[in-house]
């Protein structure tokens, strides 16, 4: 009956076609067994894949005002975030992606909801190893110490499994640079800038596997319009089964010489971890301990790590991840023995979150 309906689908109205598509999808195996051609069934039922995630997060600090810049008396914060992503196949080599996010919404605060599109881009594959993207996408600089967030522009990436290289041009869209004390006159806020105000950068980076256990990487970010600083760095990762050791270093050069007098302009992180955490695999877990040292004029903008400060910060951080169920993960972080570069105590920082993938 379904096969006959598919054969006469052109005569059906829109409602009937939708019903035929649903039935064809439901009985795909049976139709195949009967010899009915359903190889293009995915084109009938749509070529858009919907994925997403939801997060419930708690943050706390020993000191007031470090969790929320809007409330200097607050020592803890409980918020939530939801994101939905649409991946559409335009053809065999081209795809379009749109992601909607709620932003971080604090529980009980009716003013923090801010739904927006944080991913809108197209991607085209050239052969097996090369992909070009353009639009608003996610950029991962180096190992993520300096930047892991939204990027507006275009990029070309090559990755054969053992060696990868990326060239990109555009603007960072989140975080801030040099927004610290005496450097405020040189600061740049990427998250609150018009297209005329925002800086543009050219990013070149590469990463290679050295044997079975080591991976080394490096990047160089050229400051273009509205940014007179080049940011660069390198990383090393060692993996031995479930054991990981790694670190990353980043600094900047000042092209016009105004900041040369500063010697405290670098940032680095090093750590060790154990485990095989995968949120898609129930019961997997991982633990990690890292040490962060970020100078007063650190080039960190929006880091992949969950340290509470981008600059003038030194601390240890312990973290643990556990997959409670398939696609449900619990993570906890504790930053301790924290101080600024002058030795002043900054207090401990705590973070716990539940993540859901779908």
Language-model segments: what does each one mean?
Residues 1-55:
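N-terminal periplasmic/intermembrane-space "pro-region" immediately following the signal or transit peptide
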Residues 10-14, 18, 22, 38, ...:
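Outer-membrane beta-barrel pore domains
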Residues 46-49, 53-56, 73-182, 198-215, ...:
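Outer membrane beta-barrel
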Residues 151-155, 186, 306-310:
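Short, low-complexity, polar/charged sequence segments that are solvent-exposed and flexible
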Residues 178-194:
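Intrinsically disordered, low-complexity Ser/Thr- and acidic-rich flexible linkers and loops
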Residues 186, 193, 204-206, 234:
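Compositionally biased, intrinsically disordered low-complexity segments
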């Amino acid at each position: 009956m379904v096969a006959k309906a598919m054969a006469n689908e052109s005569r059906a109205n829109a409602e009937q076609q939708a019903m035929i598509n649903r039935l064809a999808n439901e009985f795909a195996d049976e139709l195949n067994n009967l010899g009915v051609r359903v190889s293009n069934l995915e084109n009938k039922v749509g070529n858009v894949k919907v994925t997403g995630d939801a997060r419930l997060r708690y943050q706390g600090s020993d000191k007031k005002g470090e969790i929320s810049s809007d409330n200097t008396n607050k020592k803890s914060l409980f918020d939530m975030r939801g994101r939905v992503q649409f991946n559409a196949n335009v053809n065999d080599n081209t795809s379009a992606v749109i992601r909607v996010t709620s932003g971080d919404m604090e529980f009980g605060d009716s003013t923090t909801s801010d739904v927006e599109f944080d991913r809108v881009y197209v991607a085209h594959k050239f052969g097996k190893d090369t992909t070009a993207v353009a639009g608003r996408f996610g950029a991962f600089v180096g190992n993520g110490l300096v930047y892991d967030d939204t990027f507006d522009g275009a990029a070309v990436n090559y990755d054969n499994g053992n060696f990868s290289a990326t060239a990109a041009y555009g603007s960072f869209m989140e975080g801030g640079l040099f927004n610290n004390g005496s450097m405020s006159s040189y600061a740049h806020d990427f998250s609150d800038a018009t297209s005329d105000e925002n800086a543009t950068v050219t990013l070149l980076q590469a990463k290679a596997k050295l044997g079975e256990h080591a991976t080394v990487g490096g990047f160089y970010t050229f400051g273009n319009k509205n940014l007179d600083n080049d940011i660069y760095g390198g990383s090393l990762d060692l993996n031995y089964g479930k054991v990981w050791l790694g670190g990353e270093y980043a600094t900047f050069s000042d092209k016009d010489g105004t900041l040369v007098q500063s010697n405290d302009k670098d940032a680095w992180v090093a750590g060790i971890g154990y485990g095989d955490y995968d949120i898609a695999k129930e019961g997997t877990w991982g633990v990690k301990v890292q040490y962060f040292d970020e100078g007063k004029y650190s080039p960190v903008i929006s880091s992949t790590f969950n340290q509470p400060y981008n600059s003038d910060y030194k601390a240890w951080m312990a973290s643990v991840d556990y997959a409670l169920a398939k696609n449900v993960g619990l993570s906890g972080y504790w930053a301790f023995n924290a101080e600024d570069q002058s030795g002043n105590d900054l207090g401990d920082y705590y973070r716990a979150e539940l993540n859901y993938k779908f």
